[in-house]
Amino acid sequence: MSRVKRGVAAHAKHKKVLKAAKGFYGRRKNTIRAAKAAVDRSKQFAYRDRKVNKRNFRALWIQRINAAVRESGLTYGRFIDGLNKAGIEVDRKVLSDMAIHEPAAFGALVEASKKALSYLKDTGTKNEFETAVK
């Protein structure tokens, strides 16, 4: 029976792990045991943060839309409600982009949203709740 020497395979595995650990600080970049643990952990973070990234972008789009809509006297929630009642289906990413790059088109959507909301007064700028509070 011939003897199997696994040096080549082990070296290839170690090289793969150390390549993934490139740029890490301290022993994590050059000792195999520390590098393996660090790379495994970094993969877990990457997996988790791919999901978190989606949440963060949605929150950013909502903040941008809210800021743009408040200039017209609406809130984000009422604006979205008005769009739904008007039957306008535009996702938040596109709305955010329109608010930044195409303010005129976004303004048209705001006006369409205001018209669809029945609780706005004839002026179209303030709702009943805001006027009752003052």
Curated annotation (Swiss-Prot):
Pfam families: Ribosomal_L20. It comes from Allorhizobium ampelinum (strain ATCC BAA-846 / DSM 112012 / S4) (Agrobacterium vitis (strain S4)). Keywords: Ribonucleoprotein, Ribosomal protein, RNA-binding, rRNA-binding. One of its GO terms (biological process) is ribosomal large subunit assembly. Binds directly to 23S ribosomal RNA and is necessary for the in vitro assembly process of the 50S ribosomal subunit. It is not involved in the protein synthesizing functions of that subunit. CDD domains: Ribosomal_L20. InterPro entries: Ribosomal_bL20, RIBOSOMAL_L20_CS, Ribosomal_protein_bL20_C. This is Large ribosomal subunit protein bL20. Belongs to the bacterial ribosomal protein bL20 family. PROSITE patterns: RIBOSOMAL_L20. The gene is rplT.
